A protein has these predicted regions:
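Membrane-proximal extracellular/periplasmic loop immediately following the first transmembrane helix
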Residues: 29-35
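Extended hydrophobic/Leu-rich segments
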Residues: 10-14, 32, 52
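Extended boundary segments
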Residues: 35-82
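Extracytoplasmic/periplasmic soluble domains downstream of a signal peptide or transmembrane helix
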Residues: 15, 64-180
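Alpha-helical transmembrane signal-anchor/signal-peptide segments
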Residues: 13-29
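Single conserved hydrophobic/aromatic residue that forms the stacking wall/gate
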Residues: 1-7, 11
Length: 180
């Protein structure tokens, strides 16, 4: 046998090791998942629903369409299936309280009588808060039902750092400011 043939045999018997390194790029599968989620976020372009303003707690935030996990990473989301502003029903919007920019971090400071504005299309809808409640997360869907009036309902997790309950702030439509 010649030496190149012997070297070739040794090479063939070595296990194939791709990405062999002392410093792996990903320490755990969890890190890889985080990277994968980041890639999904970069690819995802949410549809903007409107602009939400709550002056008393310094909220001035774009609202996206949808309340799925990915959409809510970009800001508050309009519950699909709830009404559009000015259409004679309940407009539902959910937002995070402690993560992803925490757009509703101070929602618990809103009081009855506070003003909330939602710009949708070319109109600005003015709402006055008339109801604040805390409901169980598993049974609180009724807060999004239509009550026979034009209203806006905001929901977020309650208490902070928990998903057990929902803080629900609701307001009645008082005025539509035309942008035309």
């Amino acid at each position: 046998r010649n030496s190149s043939s012997a070297a070739s045999d040794v090479y063939k018997r070595q296990p194939l090791r791709l990405f062999q390194t002392d410093n792996p790029v990903f320490e755990t599968l969890q890190e890889l998942t985080v990277i994968d989620q980041s890639a999904k976020i970069e690819e995802f372009q949410p549809e903007i629903f409107g602009l939400l303003e709550i002056p008393d707690i310094n909220v001035n935030q774009y609202v996206v369409s949808g309340t799925d996990e990915l959409s809510l990473q970009f800001g508050p989301g309009h519950y699909l299936g709830t009404k559009l502003p000015g259409s004679g029903g309940n407009v539902g919007i959910a937002g995070h309280r402690t993560t992803y920019g925490a757009p509703f971090s101070r929602l618990d400071l809103v009081e009855i009588g506070d003003e909330i504005y939602l710009t949708y299309g070319s109109n600005k809808y003015h709402y006055i808060v008339d109801d604040i409640e805390v409901v169980d997360a598993n049974t609180g869907d009724y807060v999004l039902f239509n009550r026979g009036d034009d209203r806006l309902t905001l929901t977020t997790c309650h208490p902070r750092y928990s998903a057990r309950q929902r803080l629900v702030v609701s307001g009645i439509l008082t005025r539509i400011e035309s942008g035309n």
